Design a protein with these regions (language model features):
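Flexible, acidic/Gly-rich N-terminal and inter-domain linker regions that tether
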Residues: 1-24, 30-34, 219-226
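Canonical Radical SAM [4Fe-4S] cluster-binding loop centered on the CxxxCxxC motif
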Residues: 15-54, 67
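Short, small-residue-enriched loops and turns at beta-alpha junctions
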Residues: 27, 46, 78-82, 170-173, ...
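Residue-level signature of catalytic and energy-coupling elements of molecular machines
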Residues: 27, 117, 192
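Radical SAM/AdoMet-radical enzyme domain recognition
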Residues: 51-74, 81-189
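A C-terminal junction/extension of Radical SAM enzymes
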Residues: 187, 191-228
């Protein structure tokens, strides 16, 4: 990082000359799913006394704003399982200097929280969904929660809230659904993002696809689609 100025209104610039204006915040390591490429069925959680309190996270965010950060992406684990998440989002959204707050969720608890997220003024919702097949979903996540996630996606459409779907394609597991997920983007006016699996930790046992291969597949079948 070549430039770092702590004065309010200044910005951070990386070594490629790009402005750094967003921060990703993981507010919990806990999750109500057990995706095979992410975490095991049994995983000890970090104790509440060992993680940052929301007040401490907000203090970090205030300092980040003074360095030019205006956008915050809240993730986990599954952020909605942490008690007080919605109050935290409200405080972050109303913090002076903050222009955008989005949340990434697996969608299991989303429908019940959607009206509150709208009231908070959340700027975007990213939903992690790797398959449209309930049986494959249960196999991948070790949980039978597909209907709750799908209902949440439908609910976001009714609310007109900006929604994106994050999908990890794995060879031999859900890769045959590639174009079904493309059609989901078309039919529901959603942004679908295919994320490369990280070959670390529990992801080492799975084979994914690289970005170039996926872009070529889309461009070949749908030359008029906008892909990036």
């Amino acid at each position: 990082m070549d430039s770092l100025n702590g004065k309010a209104g200044k910005t951070m610039i990386d070594s490629h000359g790009r402005k750094i204006d967003y921060m990703r915040i993981s507010i919990t390591d806990r999750c109500n799913l057990r995706c095979q490429y992410c975490m095991p069925e049994e995983l000890p959680s970090i104790g509440h006394t060992e993680i940052l309190r929301f007040e401490e996270i907000l203090e970090i965010c205030r300092h980040a704003v003074s360095l030019g950060i205006t956008k915050f992406k809240v993730t986990g684990g599954e952020p909605l399982v942490r008690k007080g998440c919605l109050s935290f989002l409200r405080s972050l959204k109303t913090m002076p200097g903050v222009e955008q707050v989005t949340i990434t969720t697996n969608g299991v608890l989303l429908k019940s929280c959607l009206s509150q997220l709208e009231d908070i003024g959340i700027d975007g919702i990213n939903i992690s969904l790797d398959t449209l097949n309930p049986e494959i979903y249960e196999k991948m996540t070790r949980r039978n929660e597909f209907s709750q996630v799908w209902d949440a996606i439908v609910a976001t459409q009714a609310s007109k809230k900006r929604t994106k779907i994050n999908c990890v394609l794995l060879k031999g597991i859900n890769d045959h659904e590639f174009f079904d997920l493309i059609h989901l983007a078309r039919d529901y006016q959603l942004d679908v993002r295919f994320i490369e699996i990280m070959p670390i930790g529990y992801g080492k046992g799975f084979e994914g696809f690289d970005k170039k291969d996926l872009l070529e597949k889309i461009a070949e079948k749908y030359p008029d689609y906008q892909v990036e």
